[in-house]
Amino acid sequence: MEMELEPELEEELGVSLDELRKWIEEQVDSSEAVQKRKADLEQLQEWVEQREKEVADIDALCSNASESVVQCEALVKEVYSNMGLVYRESSSDDEGGKANPSEVIEIDDDDDDDVIAVGCLVPPKKSLTQAKDPALKEASAALQRTSQQVQNLAQTVNRTAQSGVTTPVKTGGPPGQGPLAVPAVFMSSAPRNTPTQPNPNIKQDSIKINMTLLGKKRTKTWHRGTLVAIKQVGNNLKYKVRFENKGKSLLSGNHVAFEYHPTLERLFVGARVVARYKDGNQVWLYAGVVAEMPNSKNRMRFLIFFDDGYASYVGLPELYPICRPLKKTWEDIEDASCRDFIEEYITSYPNRPMVLLKPGQIIKTEWEGTWWKSRVEEVDGSLVKMLFLDDKRSEWIYRGSTRLEPMFNLKMNTANSQEKKMAGQQRQRPNMGALRTKGPVVQYTSDNSAAASTGGGAATPGTPTRPVAPQPAGPPQPSRTESPSFKSQMAKKSTGQLALQPRQGMPSDLQPKPIINALQTNTSRLFLLQSGPVHTLTPITPAPQTVQTAISTYTNERVPQEPSYQAPNDRLFYLTHNCSPECLKRIRPTRPNLHRGRNPLLTPLLYEFRRMTGRRRLNRKMSFHVIYKSPCGLSLRNMTEIQRYLFQTQCDFIFLEMFCLDPYVLVDRRFQPQRPFYFIRDITSGREDIPLSCVNEIDNTPPPSVAYSKERIPEDGVYINTSADFLVGCDCTDGCRDKSKCSCHQLTLQATGCTPGGQINPNAGYHYKRLDECLPTGIYECNKRCRCNMQMCTNRLVQHGLQVRLQLFKTQNKGWGIRCLDDIAKGSFVCIYAGKILTDDFADKEGLEMGDEYFANLDHIESVENFKEGYESEAHCSDSEGSGVDMSRVKLPASSRHGKSNKMEERNSSTTGKSQDDSSEESDDEKDDDSNEDDSDSSDDTFVKDTYYTTSSVWRSYTTRRQAKGLKEESQDSKDGMSVSAGEDRKPPHMPEETGKSKVASWLTNQSSTSANQSVKVEGGIKTEKKDVMTLSDSDDVQTISSGSDDNKEREKKTQAVVKRQVAVKSTRGIALKSHSMMVKSGGGGAGGGGSGPSHGHGGGGGDNGPKNTRLFFDGEESCYIIDAKLEGNLGRYLNHSCSPNLFVQNVFVDTHDLRFPWVAFFASKRIRAGTELTWDYNYEVGSVEGKELLCCCGSTECRGRLLQIIKTEWEGTWW
């Protein structure tokens, strides 16, 4: 039929079927829907091809990743074996593959010893979108597993050794799925036990006959040998070793070592090992003690203290474990000085005082009993490379060695302080001068593991941390808890009441009132502010209608915004004229405090002065210079011209301290707090001339309730005579610009004659209303008896009160602090320290009852007298023309150890005869061989304090072995130098010339003549010998000293009553004296040109010939007064501590010239940027407060780590 219809259709339609089919296809192709569908299909095809290519790439990546993981595993195994770690392989099934994946990774931060919790995104078990291609799905799953395994491997490798056994994060997928099921990696390290004790779970390796060991020879070096026999000698086993280089020895278990390298699990601080020491091309094996475990700071090396005094870093392949070490490993060290040091080091670990040094610093270093000028070449972990400038010889020294001058000073100062405490001459309070010298400081470091075990980084002393999130519904809780024993050792600073309480001294209408309780779930940051000077900013929720109304009314109110200063654009021209008051007549204000509350450095600009900064390029260096232009067009290029202009125009509303020529101090840089939770416009309630605002950007905790007072308040028993009849006044009419004619300036200048050298400084005092550095002898300002103009006088600064704009703010981890709102120029006056003035006895009682965290010592008299004493006491480290100072006659005062034999005798006896330990060498043919070896390789005097400082013993860290022969030859001279008897004449020999070296030698001779057995006078004129024997009572509060005779029983009772106080007081002296005061005799003998008096009040009048303490002239007073700002004071109480402070303390006499009652003022020691916290150095003396320990977390690069440290003292072989 079709064949029949085709001709009919073709005839009827007039077209053939092929043509019709072709036409239909053309019409379909021309349709938009069909074309769109076709394009989609083409694009889909391209996507499929691209996906196939990606799958191929992923397969290649997976293959490469699998190979990389295998290579990484091999490298990790090699690293583990080199480091002594145990590498174990286990699949996810062995470790519980069905366990939930971990969501938190603990990272041990080596920099600040904090444990940070980092949230880890766990991969989902199932993909959100199912892939259509099975190959693509499998490749994606394999890639996901591989990336997770690589992450686990990186996490395991980066974990430090102290973090214990590391368990990798489990993947979300089922265990063992896919071709890349790589076993997990585990790091097994020493458990977190006591860092100075061995792991009790590890058994000792057995010692068998014919095994290869290392044995100790008579030359103190260790050599390889074979164990030939084990003998029972008494209750101990002896091991007979035949050395490879001929010879036999019968040795004890602590004098033989295994030949293999130990694992990390077997090592700890204090472990006895044999290590290789390299000196050029020579290599020896010596016994030593592990002082540091590997960590990132020492580049994964072990610090070894060798028995002969060396200190060196070695790797694990260079260590060999001692077979049977003693329980107290330091008892195996023959040298007594080194043994004592190691014992003290291990017992006090991980607290290690070390000198903070930087390359290029110049310090004094001891070598062969003489102090030499040396330069820091390189610092490597706990070691420092010192270059002796005289002979260009370099040497590596442990940074905690007393061969370094700062450490020597610290040890001597601690010993002297303990002696004075025992003798009742010094109260147990720290000396906390406000400024330390710029030289190296002693830093207290802690081991990472020990720090981690305490729960993270410690907060700054005296300030418990607060939660970051606001909690107005209840009292905030500390975010970190501390044990009671830890709290009892901390001198905590008060961070305020937990709840809002009425503020003392404030009217009831100014009390901060919480308006509405905040909900913790509220994420919006809306604030409701109370009108008035005091505001409580509280996040609120837009719930009730009444609250909505309040929000709409007060939402736009924030912390007051200060209008910005706009410099005028018009040019200012100068016409020649003589400046007079008419130049400022146009701008002279009707009231002098028109711009009070603004930045004082901006005030001249507000009165139409111009401050312009010019620059010039000289020798490719850009320099800047600030020029002021007066309203009359006169250019003022320096402070002299500015001062002259102010006096010519009689300007009494703009003052000299309001001008600054430092181009880096910006006068219009304002600091604005970031959306605080709590804000107070002025916490002083108008008592200060400048408002002191308060903000809390952390939570809504208010500041502590303290009665504000900008003046000092004498308490009962304190009388300050401020009568003008007892003041010295001047008659200046030139604003006291001429210091030679001003009586008050002359008081300041003449006082500088009390400094070392006795020379008067003609430039002392204020320099254009600024003080660049501390003046230890104090500044005498003009007073009410002077006839000079109070506003124009250049010698009136502190008495004008607060001028800079400051703000009280809540810090993250230091409680409340003070920061500046504007830039502060160097030398500018900031504020004073005010509070109640207490007597010493009353301060002791109140400090024990209420706390001593806000005590400050008015010790100006002691500061100046100690400063004068320090001239001779620190002469041995002065930069004189002599290359060094002989310390062969210096002796540690009041040493608690007796009967110690001479070190050279010990050295000779240890090298010439048989060893005195339990090791004995047989008389075999090895004697001839041993006798040819260097017998001088005996113990040098190292690491430790010593009773006498001979040529061979000065608390040294280590000495070079090449010095042994020289020391041995000088041994007889050292013995002669130490044989000074107590009955000899104590006067120094006559010196023909008083050169730098002769003065030092004279002083050292005086020191050596004061032996441990001193003659003291008793009733009846009979002299008895006093033996210094320290007796420690069972109580932690009392530490006494007994003379060993019945004659001093009464004195012992007095001592117990004095030294039991444990009050920490800040010192208000402006400088930190070098720790050499212990070198000055504290007794009554006043021979030679050395000390000028005792360093504290109780020391005065100790002998008939000694100079009398100045304080004794004030009705026999013996102790200084205390400023207590705990309950009543000014903003100075909030200034925190820093080891790199930006403020220094200066004693200023304003209303009285009584040396006991200076004003305590703070000045800027450097340029301070707006928004920077203001800090000063409390300068606590380590070990000065018994039973107290304060950690420092100031964050400075020069942080010393400790403010107060419990110091251990050796007595009868035990550390207390």
Swiss-Prot record:
Bias-annotated ranges (Acidic residues): 918-940
Disulfides per UniProt: none
InterPro entries the UniProt entry points to: DNA-bd_dom_sf, DUF5604, Hist-Lys_N-MeTrfase_SETDB1, Methyl_CpG_DNA-bd, Post-SET_dom, Pre-SET_dom, SET_dom, SET_dom_sf
Binding site for Zn(2+) 3: 736, 782, 788, 793
PROSITE patterns in UniProt: POST_SET, PRE_SET, SAM_MT43_SUVAR39_1, SET
Pro residues composition-biased segments: 467-478
Residue ranges annotated for the Tudor domain, each copy included: 266-329, 356-412
GO molecular function: DNA binding; histone H3K4 trimethyltransferase activity; histone H3K9 methyltransferase activity; promoter-specific chromatin binding; zinc ion binding
Coiled-coil annotated spans: 38-61
Record family assignment: Belongs to the class V-like SAM-binding methyltransferase superfamily. Histone-lysine methyltransferase family. Suvar3-9 subfamily.
The protein's name in its UniProt record: Histone-lysine N-methyltransferase SETDB1-B
Gene responsible for this protein: setdb1b
